[in-house]
Amino acid sequence: MKRIRQPIIAVLGHVDHGKTTLLDRIRRTNVAGKEAGGITQHIGATEVPIETVKNLAGPLIKLWKGEIKLPGLLFIDTPGHEAFTSLRARGGSLADLAVLVVDINEGFQPQTIESIEILRKNRTPFIVAANKIDRIKGWKIEKDEPFLVNIKKQDQRAQQELETKLWELIGKFYEMGFQANRFDRVQNFTRELAIVPISAKYGIGVPELLVLIAGLSQKYLEEKLKIEVEGPARGTILEVREEIGLGTTIDVIIYDGTLHKDDTIVVGGKDKAIVTKIRALLKPKPLDEIRDPRFRFDQVDEVTAAAGVKIAAPGLEEALAGSPVIAARSEEEVEKAKQEILSQIQSVVISTGKVGVIVKADTLGSLEALSKELQEKNIPIRKADVGNISKTDVMEALSVKDEDPKYGVVLGFNVKVNEDAEEVAKARGVPIFTGNIIYKLIEDYEAWVKGEEEKKKRELLSKVTFPGVIRLYPDERYVFRRSHPAIVGIEVVEGRIRPGVTLIKQNGQKVGVIKSIKNRNDFVQEAKKGEAVAIAIEGAIVGRHIHPGETLYVDLSKNDVIILAKQLKNELDETDIKALKMTAKVKAQQDPFWKAV
């Protein structure tokens, strides 16, 4: 028997833009008030029955032609995008739909952009809640009022300010490749993003938001939401946690089938599939929050998707957040589920032994997302695993550092660095990058690589000798001093010269070292093709070693040529290459190596 399940809704957005406050308003509980700094600390799930939506939405429900058949909405209260990234189902996102909360006064922030990128990559449809309209100067507040009613009560100036802020948001979405508009102006919901102006604090606009979520889910996701009620359950672990009297439990979102209290389940572990039998199924009543510590769980016989459920069972200590849960009713199903889970873990948790970065993340889903981003940017991975950054990770990065310094690093998403790991990293110079925004984490790493390459280039440039060919002026007037040191006027014919380089004659004989270069009245550190300068040559005597009108060459070592060809190729311009070829011709008289240059 098939029926439509509740859509699973994720709430994303930047810190303090109002994600938890919005869910509170829908739930009429006050979770945000209990959280440290008003920020959601844990992952939770809340079931909102369709009756509650209808009561909140009132006459607005009639905006949708035909009856809404959904049993309700299942909200995941995520700490921003990290949890969304972690929560996967069969390679895609667990969420059917998302609400992106944006503070209309602050606009786009780093985690807003990260959230949009994640939603785009997962192809998850979303609605925008433009929050905190109550902070617009002079905004008249009526609690829980539909936005379309509330806007009519505002004066012209407040309405105009809202309009300006909305257009700023619409412009930002356009820059990211999305057509967006205020929800009541949207012509086609498949092509345009709907923006609902709301005040999560006072409930303004929340009725429209709920109607849109329910209506869009019904209209566009109906086929996806059809489940086989009697089929074996599938879900994703939100969190693994200790509960007094129950031991290690897992909070799970069931998105398919029905889970029974005596079912055998297969769960994703650190490097294995865990097979265990359910001891108790604990389900909160609608409108109560899984993660509320004051809540006493009800034991239930079965749970049908979509639902948030706590499972108590033996052997869950090594279960991984973000990994799959599959119910199995026969030995054959157990084996099949084990293979499926193992292949999923093995595709994400990797150890190649090749030169590449070390990647650590808090859950399987976030590890998969981070690895994917790195692969798209052609950054090789040596090891990708779940868990905090350990001393072993640092030592492995150290071995890579010896082969290729730019990959001898550890990247950690939403994880801590163990104390001993930090000590070794500092002592041995292994960079550790951590953060909770994937693109920012990769950006920081790329900026470091760029900085290191620039530093290396500067070091090489200071050590390497560039090719240069000069000609002494034929007129004796340009011989300013004959010796100790010889000072002569020259023209740079090809390439460049710097103080400290040795000069050689046409026959390869060394004549002296350039001590200084003077351009008119100033001493300079470099002279390039076409420049006329005076140079002081230590060790040369005019008339004995060098003569007016003579061509001289900057002496190069084989090492100079190798560095220039391999590491500083982009620093050589056309005239440098000409100078190199001319010098190679001179040096080839004594060493066949130079014939190949």
UniProtKB/Swiss-Prot annotation:
Pfam families: GTP_EFTU, GTP_EFTU_D2, GTP_EFTU_D4, IF-2. Residues 199-201 are annotated as: G5. Residues 77-80 are annotated as: G3. PROSITE patterns: G_TR_2. Keywords: GTP-binding, Initiation factor, Nucleotide-binding, Protein biosynthesis. The keyword Protein biosynthesis applies. Residues 13-20 are annotated as: G1. The keyword Protein biosynthesis applies. Residues 131-134 are annotated as: G4. Residues 4-221 form the tr-type G domain. InterPro entries: EFTu-like_2 (IPR004161), EFTU-type (IPR029459), P-loop_NTPase (IPR027417), Small_GTP-bd (IPR005225), T_Tr_GTP-bd_dom (IPR000795), TF_aIF-2_arc (IPR004544), TIF_IF2 (IPR015760), TIF_IF2_dom3 (IPR023115). GTP binds at residues 13-20, 77-81, 131-134. Residues 38-42 are annotated as: G2. It comes from the Archaea. Function in general translation initiation by promoting the binding of the formylmethionine-tRNA to ribosomes. Seems to function along with eIF-2. Belongs to the TRAFAC class translation factor GTPase superfamily. Classic translation factor GTPase family. IF-2 subfamily. This is Probable translation initiation factor IF-2. It comes from Thermococcus onnurineus (strain NA1). The gene is infB.
